[in-house]
C-alpha cells in the first residue's frame, strides 16, 4: 500500500525531549495549513500546573493518566500536527491511538546532542522533571535505550536530527508525509 492510500488524520511527532518536536510542529503546521498542538501544553492547561508539579503531586502514574486522557481528546479533533511528550509512547493505549489516528515521525538524536540541547533550554529544569537520579547524560542514555524500541514501533518515519537544521528536517517530513495530511506549501 502506498502513502496515498492511507488516510491518516494527524501528523504526530515523537522522540525524546530536546529533539525538536515542539519547534517542528509549529513549522509543519504553518507549511501544511494545519493547527498544531503540544500535548504537554494541553496537559498543563488542563491540570492548571506544570508537568514537574504533576509529577511531584501525582507521581508519574498520575501524569501518564493525564497524558493518555489528553491524547485521546486531541486525537478526536480535526486534523492537527501534534507534538507528543517524550514518554507518550510508553503506554500501549497511546501507541494504539497514534497508530489508528495518524502518521508518526520519530525525531531521534544522539545522546550527547540531546544533553547539549537540554542544557541550553531554560524551561527544561523548571518544566520537566528528572526521570531518574542519574546525571543528565546517563539519564538520556538509560531512558532512550528503554524507549527506542517503542519509538521505532510507533514511527512511520525516523529522522536523526543530531546534525541537521530545522529546514532540512522540515523538508524531509514534508516530502515523506502522506498527501492526505494538510495542504503542503513546498515553497
Curated annotation (Swiss-Prot):
Keywords recorded for this protein, A-Z: Amino-acid biosynthesis, Aromatic amino acid biosynthesis, ATP-binding, Cytoplasm, Kinase, Magnesium, Metal-binding, Nucleotide-binding, Transferase
Cofactor notes: Binds 1 Mg(2+) ion per subunit.
GO MF annotations, alphabetized:
ATP binding; magnesium ion binding; shikimate kinase activity
Chain positions recorded as substrate binding sites: 40, 64, 86, 147
EC number of this enzyme: 2.7.1.71
Coiled-coil segments on the chain, per record: none
Main enzyme class: transferase
Cofactor(s) essential for the protein: Mg(2+)
Q: Choose any GO biological process term that the UniProt entry carries and state it.
A: amino acid biosynthetic process
Assembly and interaction partners: Monomer.
Quote the protein name from its UniProt record. Shikimate kinase
What is the native source organism of this protein? Answer: Rhodopirellula baltica (strain DSM 10527 / NCIMB 13988 / SH1)
Lineage here is:
Bacteria, Pseudomonadati, Planctomycetota, Planctomycetia, Pirellulales
Gene of this entry: aroK
Amino acid at each position: 500500500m502506498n502513502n496515498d492510500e492511507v488516510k491518516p488524520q494527524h501528523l504526530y511527532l515523537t522522540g525524546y525531549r530536546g529533539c525538536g518536536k515542539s519547534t517542528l510542529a509549529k513549522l509543519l503546521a504553518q507549511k501544511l495549513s494545519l493547527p498544531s498542538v503540544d500535548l504537554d501544553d494541553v496537559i498543563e492547561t488542563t491540570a492548571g500546573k506544570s508537568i514537574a508539579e504533576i509529577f511531584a503531586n501525582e507521581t508519574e502514574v498520575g501524569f501518564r493518566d493525564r497524558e493518555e486522557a489528553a491524547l485521546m481528546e486531541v486525537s478526536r479533533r480535526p486534523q492537527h500536527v501534534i507534538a507528543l511528550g517524550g514518554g507518550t509512547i510508553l503506554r500501549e493505549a497511546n501507541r494504539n491511538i497514534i497508530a489508528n489516528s495518524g502518521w508518526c515521525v520519530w525525531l531521534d538524536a544522539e545522546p550527547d546532542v540531546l544533553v547539549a540541547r537540554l542544557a541550553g533550554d531554560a524551561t527544561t529544569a523548571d518544566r520537566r522533571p528528572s526521570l531518574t537520579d542519574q546525571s543528565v547524560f546517563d539519564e538520556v542514555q538509560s531512558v532512550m535505550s528503554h524507549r527506542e524500541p517503542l519509538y521505532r514501533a510507533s514511527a512511520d518515519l525516523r529522522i536523526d536530527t543530531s546534525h541537521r537544521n530545522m529546514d532540512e528536517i522540515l523538508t524531509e517530513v514534508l516530502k515523506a508525509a502522506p498527501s492526505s495530511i494538510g495542504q503542503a506549501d513546498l515553497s
